[in-house]
Amino acid sequence: MAASGKLGTFRLPPLPTIREIIKLFGLRAVKQLSQNFLLDLRLTDKIVRKAGSLADVYVYEVGPGPGGITRSILNANVAELLVVEKDTRFIPGLQMLSDAAPGKLRIVHGDVLTYKIEKAFPGNIRRQWEDDPPNVHIIGNLPFSVSTPLIIKWLENISLKDGPFVYGRTKMTLTFQKEVAERLVATTGSKQHSRLSIMAQYLCNVEHLFTIPGKAFVPKPKVDVGVVHLTPLIEPKIKQPFKLVEKVVQNAFQFRRKYCHRGLGMLFPEAQRLESTGRLLQLADIDPTLRPTHLSLMHFKSLCDVYRKMCDEDPQLFTYNFREELKQKKSKGQEKDGDPESCGF
């Protein structure tokens, strides 16, 4: 991905600094919400540059907070910037930015996990999935507490071509806890290789752009932060329903230090577990003694394809949840323990 060499020609007028905005409105980061403010405009400008050219692009910023990255985006000559902020304390500071950039900044008080963006931008900017990405870009300094559920939600949106991806293969430039960023780009065999690696990489081209030291944030988090760029692929590397892929991958990685047959076995009811797991691995041509971290995307493609066929043969298989079976067994065991006849009374 080629990064834009410089920010756009539009410049905001002189404004209070982000630090002054924080002081002016009495803002403070809420630890329970994993809030950390990025005050250095050189770093926010770098995030925007690494996102690529945003000239005449419709940008959706999630969690703008006091507006550090927001300023850098506005200075990139965007067509329009839509920000969605859940915390009402930040709205007055963002409104100040909106007043300084008439017609450029739209503020929505809402939750990014539930906000419907499908009709937020003009319909004429939509592109076919096979075409180049549309002039829409998602940018955000994500709170650690929502980053993983949010990216999983967006990955499912990609698979369905809905949500932010009704416009086409919308690009994303997002911050994550460094460990999460490393998992998103991890290669087969690395210790960071995980469920998140497979789920992201089967649907997107994923690039870890750079790392921001924790000391750059206020308050300083205990970890560094990674900036990640994701571009949806024209064709997913696994052509099965998202929920099916997610189920196979989740089960495979739940016992990441054991052989892969251990976790994959949890896809099947106990009565048929040994036989069905053996059949799955044999048909997928996978060594049952491989560790989950050594299962590649192509391994998971084979596993998902075979598991889909097994589900087609036995439709109840897809809805099977080993935790539910375990819960039922425990419940029956407790009932038996409490039965007077079973206790000899």
Curated annotation (Swiss-Prot):
Keyword Transcription listed? The answer is yes
Q: What subcellular locations does the record give?
A: Mitochondrion
Q: Which InterPro entries does the entry link to?
A: KsgA/Erm, rRNA_Ade_diMease-like_C, rRNA_Ade_Mease_Trfase_CS, rRNA_Ade_methylase_Trfase_N, rRNA_adenine_dimethylase, SAM-dependent_MTases_sf
Molecular function per GO: DNA binding; RNA binding; rRNA (adenine-N6,N6-)-dimethyltransferase activity; S-adenosyl-L-methionine binding
Q: Which GO biological process annotations does it have?
A: rRNA methylation
Q: Tell me the superkingdom of the source.
A: Eukaryota
**PROSITE patterns cross-referenced by the UniProt entry:** RRNA_A_DIMETH, SAM_RNA_A_N6_MT
Q: Return the transit peptide range from the UniProt record.
A: 1-27
Catalytic reaction list: adenosine(N)/adenosine(N+1) in rRNA + 4 S-adenosyl-L-methionine = N(6)-dimethyladenosine(N)/N(6)-dimethyladenosine(N+1) in rRNA + 4 S-adenosyl-L-homocysteine + 4 H(+)
Entry comment describing in which tissues the protein is expressed: Ubiquitously expressed.
Identify the residues that bind S-adenosyl-L-methionine.
L38, G63, E85, K86, D111, V112, N141
Traits of the deletion mutant: Mutant homozygous mice exhibit embryonic lethality. Conditional loss of Tfb1m in heart, leads to loss of dimethylation on adenosine(1006)/adenosine(1007) of 12S rRNA, decreases steady-state levels of 12S rRNA, induces instability of the small subunit of the ribosome and abolishes mitochondrial translation.
* Keywords, in A-Z order: DNA-binding, Methyltransferase, Mitochondrion, RNA-binding, rRNA processing, S-adenosyl-L-methionine, Transcription, Transcription regulation, Transferase, Transit peptide
Known EC number(s)? 2.1.1.-
Q: Which of the seven top EC classes does this enzyme belong to?
A: transferase
Q: Name one GO cellular component term.
A: mitochondrion
Q: Which NCBIfam families match?
A: ksgA
Per UniProt, subunit arrangement is: Interacts with mitochondrial RNA polymerase POLRMT. Interacts with TFAM. Remains bound to the maturing mtSSU until the late stages of assembly.
Protein family according to the UniProt entry:
Belongs to the class I-like SAM-binding methyltransferase superfamily. rRNA adenine N(6)-methyltransferase family. KsgA subfamily.
**Entry's HAMAP family?**
16SrRNA_methyltr_A (MF_00607)
Q: What is this protein called?
A: Dimethyladenosine transferase 1, mitochondrial
What's the source species for this entry? Mus musculus
